[in-house]
Amino acid sequence: MKVGIPSEIKAQESRVGLTPQSVQQLTNHGHEVLVENNAGFGAGFENADYEKAGAKIASSAADVFNDSDMIVKVKETQSAEVNMLRENQILFTYLHLSAAPELTKGLVDSKSICIAYETVTDENNRLPLLAPMSAVAGRMSIQAGAHSLEKPQGGRGLLIGGAPGVNPGNVLILGGGVVGENAATIATGMEAKVYIVDKSEARLKELQAKFGDRIIPLVSDDINLENYVAETDLLIGGVLIPGANAPKLITKDMLKVMKRGSVIVDVAIDQGGCVETSKPTTHADPTYVIDDVVHYCVANMPGGVPRTSTLALNAATLPFVLQLAQSGYRDALNSDANFLAGLNVCQGNVTYKAVAEDLGYNFVDPSTAIN
């Protein structure tokens, strides 16, 4: 199979779909790999590294799209890229379609085969291709939030871990999944006072077993969230409904009870955000203020650390890329129900139920669509 790796063109995105080491695995199996000129530069990979691994360097994205059977990316396709997709071409990347109606329409119209990293599952119904970037984003959320709390950034002027004789700040983490756990790892390491809200008592017990008395677990059904929001210095939004829009847990009215200069980091912004007042921002202009509350809503947080993120992502995605290249999409997906869960759009059909429901498309069962 011919596999193409274009440069990422989303604002301030420097990750790359495959590392030279991953390319080497593909070429060792007899596949051709075409990499756009300097696609890996931002993540620390040179053209020569890819050529040494057996790839060819293409001068433009158009060449990559035109000459490849499968496109492997990181972030959702931008409009210029959607226009280059063709019927039956495989696209393997993050998509987050429930929050992107225009992108979804473009992919449907292209009649390409669109497999989303974020909805591939495993035997335990976890999300193995979303988890690496969720871990990175969770860790970054505390760093970004702590920085945003500084006075020059518009924050309260508060050191999240406190100081000798000074109490630490309060961190409220919504969601005890991969984002929440990794946010708690950094927040507790910085000696903040950390609250984690989740609807699952079993998950909260797991987190308490890991963190002990360094966290305060809260069952979401048993609390008045507004009371905790009022005492929060840094709020992390890490809730997820796989493939669907995130629930709006924090309303605009709740902002009125928050402290002046407090900070919200909405990691769920890729799926529309879990805060009513969230809107996507970029690394170049990451924050805005509503009702005296700083909002940090960068939609590609892991893109700020492209070296770490690319290596972590490739460790998870490479086996699936190899499976697609070796078997083709029909055999690869038919033989693995967990992989089939990643199919979001196929030959003009929406094949992920949450996306179809959120955006008003007819849902076509993925096993039907590929056969």
Task: Report the location of each language-model feature.
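An N-terminal-biased, well-structured beta-alpha scaffold segment characteristic
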Residues: K2-G106, S110
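Adenosine-phosphate binding glycine-rich loop
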Residues: E118-L159, I269, C274-N371
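Generic hydrophobic/aromatic pocket-lining and core-packing "Φ" positions
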Residues: V23, N47, T104, I142, ...
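Short glycine-/small-residue-rich Rossmann-like dinucleotide-binding loops
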Residues: D69, K75-E76, L95-H96, D221, ...
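Glycine/serine-rich phosphate-binding loop and adjoining beta1-alpha1 elements at the start
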Residues: K2, E8, T77-G169, V298-N300
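Rossmann-like adenosine-cofactor binding region
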Residues: A209-D291
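Glycine-rich phosphate/diphosphate-binding loop of Rossmann-like nucleotide-binding domains
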Residues: P6-G42, P152-L240, T287
